[in-house]
């Protein structure tokens, strides 16, 4: 992808304002989708170098602000100009404190650099960010190479701290025809016993994405088989070998 990220005009105005108080970056799935040649449906912006109250004050003139997570630095803004909704957040650190998907303490830290902020992402291809002012991609984990190769690879060993990421790998593989890196599959296999720690609604959320958005559904099931997680879904496991 060589063309610049097509940012909505109302969001550009917000980014210009944020530039005066911090360092905004586009992050997450929107950047990934753009690099895949798709039109991003969501715009997530991470703002370093500022505090949460300054971010709220800066964005309030542009729409209705909804503080959805003050303790972990997340703000939604519904644009006055278009009624589009954008997510803004501070960079944050995660500390594992208990079992399962929710056993974390999340701490906003606007002093984190791009590499440190990206380290909490699940896969390298989701850890790419975009500087809207220089049009530069920030890619500390070589996610662009994995994206071109269609490989889901973990950013760090902390991947195993959230077992939901295995099911996220399942639905991403199915949606984008991705394959799972061998070393990532081994990590997933090492936490297969933690499946029961996951909330039912979060498990359903990942399966729902698989069911609705899959391009190659079998790729997701292959991920489950590679990782030893297929055993948790016996009804599907029993279909192996059928046509």
How would you label these PLM feature ranges?
Residues 1-243:
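Catalytic cores of the polymerase beta-like nucleotidyltransferase superfamily
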């Amino acid at each position: 992808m060589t063309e610049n990220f097509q940012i909505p005009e109302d969001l550009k105005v917000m980014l210009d304002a944020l530039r005066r108080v911090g360092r905004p970056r586009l992050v997450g799935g929107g950047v990934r989708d753009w690099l895949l040649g798709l039109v991003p449906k969501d715009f997530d912006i991470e703002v370093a170098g500022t505090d949460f109250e300054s971010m709220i004050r800066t964005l309030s003139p542009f729409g209705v602000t909804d503080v959805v997570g003050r303790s972990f630095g997340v703000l939604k803004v519904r644009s006055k100009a278009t009624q589009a909704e954008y997510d803004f957040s501070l960079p944050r650190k995660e500390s594992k404190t208990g079992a399962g998907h929710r056993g974390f303490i999340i701490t906003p830290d606007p002093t984190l650099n791009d590499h440190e902020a990206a380290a909490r992402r699940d896969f390298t291809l989701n850890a790419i960010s975009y500087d809207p002012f220089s049009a530069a991609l920030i890619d500390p984990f070589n996610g662009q190479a994995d994206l071109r190769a269609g490989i889901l690879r973990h950013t760090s060993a902390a991947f195993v701290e959230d077992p939901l990421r295995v099911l996220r790998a399942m639905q991403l593989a199915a949606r984008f025809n991705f394959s799972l890196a061998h070393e990532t599959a081994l990590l997933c296999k090492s936490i297969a016993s933690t499946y029961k720690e996951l909330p039912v609604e979060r498990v359903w959320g990942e399966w729902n994405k698989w069911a609705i958005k899959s391009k190659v559904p079998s790729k997701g099931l292959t991920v489950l088989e590679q990782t030893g997680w297929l055993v948790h879904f016996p009804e599907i496991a029993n279909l192996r070998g059928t046509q």
